[in-house]
């Protein structure tokens, strides 16, 4: 059985896209299992940058099967725009398969997302306003519309009519917002359904079949561990489960099929939006990290909050997803620092913290326990062998592995595919 998986260990933006692309080159099948178009990642191929939001990273290769699984929520308009944009850049989406069980983002989901966020004022959680949360809420409430419903007109009209009536009451009565139009939505989604029809299939069966045939299957995670609905810094989280268990349910295969689980660790820490961030640096260090790392959101363009690497977070992620290996990214961004700090523990009210706090008040009150390591103060972006890395760079990543208890698997020293150092077989 040849499977591999990529998980973000922090708050997202760890460089998962680059690691996924690196592994995808050797895969036969690439599977997206959760999330929606709220998370973007950039993949650089032949010095050309591709910004992907819904499409699996394997779409950039002609010989890969690409699957958008059951756990993904799909905005058909956005997906079709992404396919069109890809084709304009000389790539084809003919290898794409979309789960007939996946839930569909509707215009009223986006309207509700925007209205709800606006109503919160200073208490907003930083949603991307793409309708992801309201779509997942409908899924849980068992009133959602699935891809398969788009091809059963009677069912689709019935579900759409119910939802439009209910959602318009919420929009107009609760939020004093504009209602959505049933006829316009129906007409648009009939067109979307026809355009996507050739891609729709039973992806659960497709993934299982590929595994049984011993094909190399890569499970591609979106968002990251600290945004997990159950285990992240709730309520500043996403609406799905971007951990290994979420990939199992989202792709429709049992957990024993998930092997070679890589946890992607950015060599420093970033976060977009509100929520606790124990190692955040609201100073020159933070500004330098943001400038050197070009830390702005792929989808939103928002400046990311920056700070020192927090190994309490990474260690927590390692346990939640039973990580097999670490993939350290953006190590080159730290090239100019004379010294570096990593958080190896928290203190709360003067006492060492065991595990990871559930209470946001406790987490915000935690004081990071830092270790200081010497920097390497040299350009490592051209290095292609682990042994050629400066001694202090090796000590930095090896300390990460030591504290988290997870061995190193990949070290990235730049955005391009060839700026990657493999330490293990990825399948």
Residues covered by each model-derived region:
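Non-transmembrane, aqueous-exposed alpha-helical and coiled segments at domain scale
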Residues: 1-427
């Amino acid at each position: 059985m040849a499977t591999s998986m990529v998980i973000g260990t922090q708050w997202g933006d760890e460089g998962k896209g680059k690691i996924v692309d690196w592994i995808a080159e050797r895969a036969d099948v690439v599977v997206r299992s959760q999330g929606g178009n709220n998370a973007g990642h950039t993949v650089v191929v032949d010095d050309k940058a591709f910004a992907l939001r819904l499409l699996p990273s394997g779409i950039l290769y002609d010989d890969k099967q690409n699957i958008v699984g059951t756990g993904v929520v799909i905005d058909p308009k956005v997906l079709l725009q992404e396919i069109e944009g890809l084709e304009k850049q000389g790539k084809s989406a003919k290898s794409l398969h979309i789960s007939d069980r996946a839930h569909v983002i509707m215009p009223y989901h986006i309207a509700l997302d925007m209205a709800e966020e606006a109503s919160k004022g200073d208490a907003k959680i930083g949603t991307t306003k793409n309708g992801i949360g309201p779509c997942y809420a409908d899924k849980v409430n068992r009133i959602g519309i699935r891809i398969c419903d788009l091809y059963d007109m009677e069912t689709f009209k019935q579900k759409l009519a119910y939802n439009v009536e209910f959602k318009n009451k919420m929009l107009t009565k609760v939020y004093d917002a504009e209602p959505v139009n049933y006829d316009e939505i129906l007409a648009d989604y009939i067109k979307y359904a026809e355009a996507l029809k050739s891609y729709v299939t039973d992806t659960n069966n497709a993934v299982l079949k590929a595994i049984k045939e011993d094909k190399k299957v890569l499970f591609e995670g979106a968002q990251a561990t600290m945004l997990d609905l159950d285990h992240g810094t709730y309520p500043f989280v996403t609406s799905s489960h971007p951990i290994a268990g979420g990939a199992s349910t989202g792709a429709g295969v049992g957990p024993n099929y998930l092997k070679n689980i890589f946890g992607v660790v950015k060599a420093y820490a970033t976060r977009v939006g509100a929520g606790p961030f124990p190692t955040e640096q609201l100073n020159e260090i933070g500004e330098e990290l943001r400038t050197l790392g070009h830390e702005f959101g792929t989808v939103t363009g928002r400046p990311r909050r920056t700070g020192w690497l927090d190994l309490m977070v990474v260690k927590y992620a390692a346990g939640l997803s039973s990580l097999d290996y670490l993939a350290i990214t953006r190590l080159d961004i730290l090239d100019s620092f004379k010294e570096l700090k990593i958080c190896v523990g928290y203190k709360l009210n003067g006492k060492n913290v065991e595990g990871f706090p559930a209470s946001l008040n406790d987490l915000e009150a935690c004081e990071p326990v830092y270790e200081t390591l010497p920097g390497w103060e040299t350009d490592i972006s051209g290095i292609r062998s682990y042994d050629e890395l400066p001694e202090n760079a090796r000590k930095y990543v090896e300390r990460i592995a030591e504290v988290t208890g997870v061995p190193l698997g990949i070290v990235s020293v730049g955005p391009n595919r060839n700026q990657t150092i493999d330490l293990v077989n990825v399948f």
